[in-house]
Amino acid sequence: DIKIEHITSIIDSMEPVEGAIEFLQGLESKWPTLILSDTFSQFAKPMMSKLGNPTLFCHTLDIDDTGRIEGWNIRCEDHKRKTVEALTKLNFKVIASGDSYNDTSMLSSANAGILFKPPDNVIEEFPQFPVVNDFEGLMSAIESSASDMGEL
């Protein structure tokens, strides 16, 4: 019987990808920043703490009093795309970055979409998005997109 404490202790033993903390700090110093993820808040909490607790929109788990996972609650279907659409309806300019197929509807809905370290099949299927492979390249692509939108 796997309990939430077992899973979160494993996640807590992990460290952020090298450069992630500095990247997020740099991003947040310039623009409001949201992380949209298909994870669950209870899984993400240890890592988000190490990243300085950035704003995270994701799903939640149902956990009983003993710590056993009983189920999950999906915020809404395709929540990344819907979040970007809501922000653009509020006249925010949105630059989105993602690494996989499940991010492409979000990238398409944003004012600018950037693929970050995607697998080859995603690059091939979505050639309209620029591809970057490190945090320095991602920051440059974001800054360039922001400049093009008059947001720098």
Show which residues each predicted segment covers.
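A metal-dependent, Asp-based hydrolase signature
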Residues: D1-P32
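Short, charged, surface-exposed secondary-structure boundary motifs
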Residues: D64-G71, I123-P130, S140-S145
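Short, well-ordered alpha-helical microsegments
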Residues: S41-K45, D103-T104, M139
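A polyampholytic, Gly/Pro-enriched intrinsically disordered region
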Residues: G71-E85, G137, S144, D148-L152
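Short, acidic/turn-prone active-site loops that include or flank metal/cofactor-
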Residues: L56-I63, P118-V122, F135-L138
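Substrate-recognition element of Asp-dependent hydrolases with the DxDx(T/V) motif
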Residues: A20-L51, T55-T60
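Acidic, Mg2+-coordinating phosphoryl-transfer loop and its flanking beta/alpha structural elements
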Residues: T33, S37-D38, K93-N133
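Glycine/Thr-rich beta-alpha phosphate-binding loop at enzyme active sites
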Residues: N53-R81
